[in-house]
């Protein structure tokens, strides 16, 4: 990814109004993408977005660029990222485009692409789009210009798809669920899916106004969900992020259940049902407790680099069907082509219904190691803090102290100028002290 000018690990992302998330850039991006994708013969592109106010501006710019290249845009309106992947497949569109910055604040936005099969766009196609961006815009003949239309039943189509991943013989009629949609793209999808499957649903974070996406709600901040689950005496809570590709859950006692625990539940249930093929893929950030719990079940486990595209690559490399990040990206290739928060949540609910067990009890087979994550902001272009001798020295000291019962991981964020410092071990006070010691060394560089 290092030779890319625009595309990062998850498309193109930034603050709205600052390069590259500007109307003129996005218009040209639409044109360049159209020029590359038109070579493959199809003239349709699905465009979805989350609930950010800037989505209106950016979808208009994209549509203008695509039309100039001779491609037609099909708008879904606010729609979860995995829904765009699904609709791209079912419409046989040449590609899908999502306008979203996922879990970021409203003032950020981004553009990411799906290929015709609902997977992330291949590197070669992204590189071809970047090459096209260097050229001057040229417009096709007037008779060949693209058009724009709306998919009026997009939400209903995706709701039915989600429900179809839940076993027909099961129902959610015995469950009281608080669902938190982060004032994002799942606000009109997830509550309806759960209600139609029989659940008693209390919905929060379902009043988007363009600027409140991910604001103290959703998968990145479950405090409101935890409080509501306890207040309502609900069986559990489910939180999605702004674009619906992540899910985090909360049990009836208010405990957070992250992506590692969700994958453990789904993998164990797959094993019990005789449906698990191969092992499970986590990341360098996955908890040691997950690895040990899967090992006890005889389920192979592999770690990929952080990022859902790398999880998917490792899954494809090994021929495995389940992968996840602890942040809540869960990829179930027997059900979907990309991370899907609603579909992953439904598989956990199916395990609860089938086994008549609470979420708390389903998690009990996995002991989480204390894991402390500290984010340190640095000035982009000021050198690599991870290569500084003082940082290396402190990191080595901590690794020696932890021995084989802990881990240290330092990595750069793929989307922001942040160094993520993660320390994991058996003693929470110790790993907290170690994490802040390394973070202080990074700050001092």
From Swiss-Prot:
<feature type="binding site" description="via phosphate group">
    <location>
        <position position="102"/>
    </location>
    <ligand>
        <name>Mg(2+)</name>
    </ligand>
</feature>
<dbReference type="InterPro" id="IPR036900">
    <property type="entry name" value="A-D-PHexomutase_C_sf"/>
</dbReference>
<keyword id="KW-0413">Isomerase</keyword>
<protein>
    <recommendedName>
        <fullName>Phosphoglucosamine mutase</fullName>
        <ecNumber>5.4.2.10</ecNumber>
    </recommendedName>
</protein>
<dbReference type="InterPro" id="IPR005846">
    <property type="entry name" value="A-D-PHexomutase_a/b/a-III"/>
</dbReference>
<dbReference type="GO" id="GO:0006048">
    <property type="term" value="P:UDP-N-acetylglucosamine biosynthetic process"/>
</dbReference>
<keyword id="KW-0479">Metal-binding</keyword>
<feature type="active site" description="Phosphoserine intermediate">
    <location>
        <position position="102"/>
    </location>
</feature>
<feature type="binding site">
    <location>
        <position position="245"/>
    </location>
    <ligand>
        <name>Mg(2+)</name>
    </ligand>
</feature>
<dbReference type="Pfam" id="PF02879">
    <property type="entry name" value="PGM_PMM_II"/>
</dbReference>
<dbReference type="InterPro" id="IPR005844">
    <property type="entry name" value="A-D-PHexomutase_a/b/a-I"/>
</dbReference>
<comment type="function">
    <text>Catalyzes the conversion of glucosamine-6-phosphate to glucosamine-1-phosphate.</text>
</comment>
<dbReference type="GO" id="GO:0004615">
    <property type="term" value="F:phosphomannomutase activity"/>
</dbReference>
<dbReference type="InterPro" id="IPR005843">
    <property type="entry name" value="A-D-PHexomutase_C"/>
</dbReference>
<comment type="similarity">
    <text>Belongs to the phosphohexose mutase family.</text>
</comment>
<dbReference type="GO" id="GO:0009252">
    <property type="term" value="P:peptidoglycan biosynthetic process"/>
</dbReference>
<feature type="binding site">
    <location>
        <position position="243"/>
    </location>
    <ligand>
        <name>Mg(2+)</name>
    </ligand>
</feature>
<dbReference type="InterPro" id="IPR016055">
    <property type="entry name" value="A-D-PHexomutase_a/b/a-I/II/III"/>
</dbReference>
<dbReference type="Pfam" id="PF00408">
    <property type="entry name" value="PGM_PMM_IV"/>
</dbReference>
<dbReference type="InterPro" id="IPR016066">
    <property type="entry name" value="A-D-PHexomutase_CS"/>
</dbReference>
<dbReference type="InterPro" id="IPR005841">
    <property type="entry name" value="Alpha-D-phosphohexomutase_SF"/>
</dbReference>
<dbReference type="InterPro" id="IPR005845">
    <property type="entry name" value="A-D-PHexomutase_a/b/a-II"/>
</dbReference>
<keyword id="KW-0597">Phosphoprotein</keyword>
<dbReference type="GO" id="GO:0000287">
    <property type="term" value="F:magnesium ion binding"/>
</dbReference>
<dbReference type="Pfam" id="PF02878">
    <property type="entry name" value="PGM_PMM_I"/>
</dbReference>
<dbReference type="InterPro" id="IPR050060">
    <property type="entry name" value="Phosphoglucosamine_mutase"/>
</dbReference>
<feature type="binding site">
    <location>
        <position position="241"/>
    </location>
    <ligand>
        <name>Mg(2+)</name>
    </ligand>
</feature>
<feature type="modified residue" description="Phosphoserine">
    <location>
        <position position="102"/>
    </location>
</feature>
<dbReference type="GO" id="GO:0005829">
    <property type="term" value="C:cytosol"/>
</dbReference>
<dbReference type="Pfam" id="PF02880">
    <property type="entry name" value="PGM_PMM_III"/>
</dbReference>
<dbReference type="GO" id="GO:0008966">
    <property type="term" value="F:phosphoglucosamine mutase activity"/>
</dbReference>
<dbReference type="InterPro" id="IPR006352">
    <property type="entry name" value="GlmM_bact"/>
</dbReference>
<keyword id="KW-0460">Magnesium</keyword>
<dbReference type="GO" id="GO:0005975">
    <property type="term" value="P:carbohydrate metabolic process"/>
</dbReference>
